[in-house]
């Protein structure tokens, strides 16, 4: 789960990390009132969407008068903001953050992220803040410093000091930078985040350290422990199909291809998508129905997939363990009838009650393309796409 910048800054503020004063706004009038309340003389008008690169896309602007705040708010609110993270379709801006301007002397990059190789948290810092960390990693990788944190000790003063020194924080500001780094690590752990990113963390002219951006990603599986974070959820920023799928406990992620995939098990789902790519096409989605799928759940999965106009073929790939093949077959038959299926359907089933499942499909009278192996299923789905 992602949240907006202003929400992330509220979490940082509560954790004791210095952030600029800011007020969210949903209308131009609210933006003007926010600027008046903050007092100026310089404000930052920032688009709030769940994507990075807003500045380059024209979603972050400086204003030096209330009239300019009003003008910029009117331009940014409602715009379709395109960044390197949104894709060419962009995202509609429905919220703004009106914030005090900052006296920026130096910009740094700071993040806490799950490092799967070490199975620990990695604190990542760079002296090149304010720009895409991916660009820094590509152009000057030596400017990215990583410190792996032992969960038994947390980020120690020695480690935080090492990081602050490595990115050139002046001696007079080192103690505050160390404090901020330790608090970023702590808030990462306390909120069950998968990413906390401050880009940039700045050094002001008076020597103070401040976080002027905040990006949080949270582990969905831990949200039951954090109702206060769930309250930040903005469904307008999420894929409608993914929101709909979550209502039925379906693990669904939209992709750019044209073969809809319905699979049980995340590993098999990823292998299915890889096999589709191997044979020259692309999956339209990741969809794991899990081990407890019912015919009703399969029907909803079909409905969600078919809402995507790019889907030209559906591929069902089931390994029956906990999930029985006859249950999936009954669900597929019910789904085909419920949605009046008008695209080719390829089905491959192996495992528990396999023969019964195949018998149900064969006797259904539906034009189902049967496959024996995953490779066979993928090849038949790709052939159907090319013939469409």
Swiss-Prot record:
Protein name per its UniProtKB record: Succinate--CoA ligase [ADP-forming] subunit beta
Manganese listed as a keyword: no
EC number: 6.2.1.5
Gene3D superfamilies: ATP-grasp fold, A domain, ATP-grasp fold, B domain, Succinyl-CoA synthetase domains
GO cellular component: cytosol; succinate-CoA ligase complex
GO BP: succinyl-CoA metabolic process; tricarboxylic acid cycle
Cofactor binding note from Swiss-Prot or TrEMBL: Binds 1 Mg(2+) ion per subunit.
Residues reported to bind Mg(2+): 199, 213
Oligomer and partners: Heterotetramer of two alpha and two beta subunits.
InterPro entries found in the cross-reference section: ATP-grasp (IPR011761), ATP-grasp_succ-CoA_synth-type (IPR013650), ATP_grasp_subdomain_1 (IPR013815), Succ-CoA_synthase_bsu_CS (IPR017866), SUCC_ACL_C (IPR005811), Succ_CoA_ligase-like_bsu (IPR005809), Succinyl-CoA_synth-like (IPR016102)
Keywords associated with the record: ATP-binding, Ligase, Magnesium, Metal-binding, Nucleotide-binding, Tricarboxylic acid cycle
Cofactor: Mg(2+)
Keyword Metal-binding: yes
Positions bound to ATP: 46, 53-55, 99, 102, 107
Segments passing through the bilayer: none
Family: Belongs to the succinate/malate CoA ligase beta subunit family.
All residue ranges annotated as the ATP-grasp domain in the record: 9-244
Pathway(s) per entry: Carbohydrate metabolism; tricarboxylic acid cycle; succinate from succinyl-CoA (ligase route): step 1/1
Function of the protein: Succinyl-CoA synthetase functions in the citric acid cycle (TCA), coupling the hydrolysis of succinyl-CoA to the synthesis of either ATP or GTP and thus represents the only step of substrate-level phosphorylation in the TCA. The beta subunit provides nucleotide specificity of the enzyme and binds the substrate succinate, while the binding sites for coenzyme A and phosphate are found in the alpha subunit.
Binding site for substrate: 264, 321-323
HAMAP family: Succ_CoA_beta
GO MF annotations, alphabetized: ATP binding; magnesium ion binding; succinate-CoA ligase (ADP-forming) activity; succinate-CoA ligase (GDP-forming) activity
Catalytic activity: succinate + ATP + CoA = succinyl-CoA + ADP + phosphate; GTP + succinate + CoA = succinyl-CoA + GDP + phosphate
């Amino acid at each position: 789960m992602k949240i907006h910048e202003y929400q992330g800054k509220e979490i940082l503020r509560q954790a004791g990390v210095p952030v600029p004063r800011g007020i969210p706004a949903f209308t131009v009038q609210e933006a003007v009132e926010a600027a008046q309340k903050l007092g100026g003389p310089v404000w930052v008008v920032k688009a709030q969407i769940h994507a990075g690169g807003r500045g380059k896309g024209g979603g972050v602007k400086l204003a030096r008068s209330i009239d300019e705040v009003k003008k910029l708010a009117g331009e940014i609110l409602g715009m379709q903001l395109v960044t390197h993270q949104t894709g060419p379709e962009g995202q509609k801006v429905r919220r703004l953050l009106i914030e005090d301007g900052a006296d920026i002397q130096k910009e740094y990059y700071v993040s806490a992220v799950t490092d799967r190789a070490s199975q620990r948290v990695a604190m990542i810092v760079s002296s090149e803040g304010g720009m895409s960390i991916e660009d820094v990693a590509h152009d000057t990788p030596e400017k990215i410093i990583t410190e792996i944190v032992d969960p038994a000790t947390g980020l120690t003063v020695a480690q935080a000091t090492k990081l602050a020194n490595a990115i050139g924080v002046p001696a007079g500001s080192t103690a505050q930078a160390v404090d901020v780094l330790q608090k970023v690590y702590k808030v990462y752990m306390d909120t069950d985040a998968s990413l906390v990113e401050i880009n940039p963390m700045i050094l002001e002219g008076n020597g103070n350290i401040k976080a002027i951006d905040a990006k949080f990603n949270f582990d969905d599986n831990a949200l039951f422990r954090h109702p206060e974070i769930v309250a930040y959820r903005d469904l307008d920023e999420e894929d409608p199909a993914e929101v709909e799928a979550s209502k039925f406990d379906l693990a669904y992620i939209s992709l750019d291809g044209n073969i809809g995939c319905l699979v049980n098990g995340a590993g098999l789902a990823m292998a299915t998508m890889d096999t589709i790519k191997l044979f020259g096409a692309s999956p339209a989605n990741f969809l794991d129905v899990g081990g407890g799928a019912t015919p009703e759940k399969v029907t909803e999965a079909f409905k969600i997939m078919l809402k995507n106009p790019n889907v030209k073929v559906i591929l069902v790939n089931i390994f029956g363990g906990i999930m029985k093949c006859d249950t999936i077959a009954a669900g597929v038959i019910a789904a085909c009838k419920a949605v009046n299926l008008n695209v080719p359907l390829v089905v491959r089933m192996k495992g528990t009650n396999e023969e019964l499942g195949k018998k149900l499909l064969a006797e259904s009278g539906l034009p189902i393309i049967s496959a024996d192996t995953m490779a066979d299923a993928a090849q038949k789905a790709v052939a159907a796409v090319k013939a469409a």
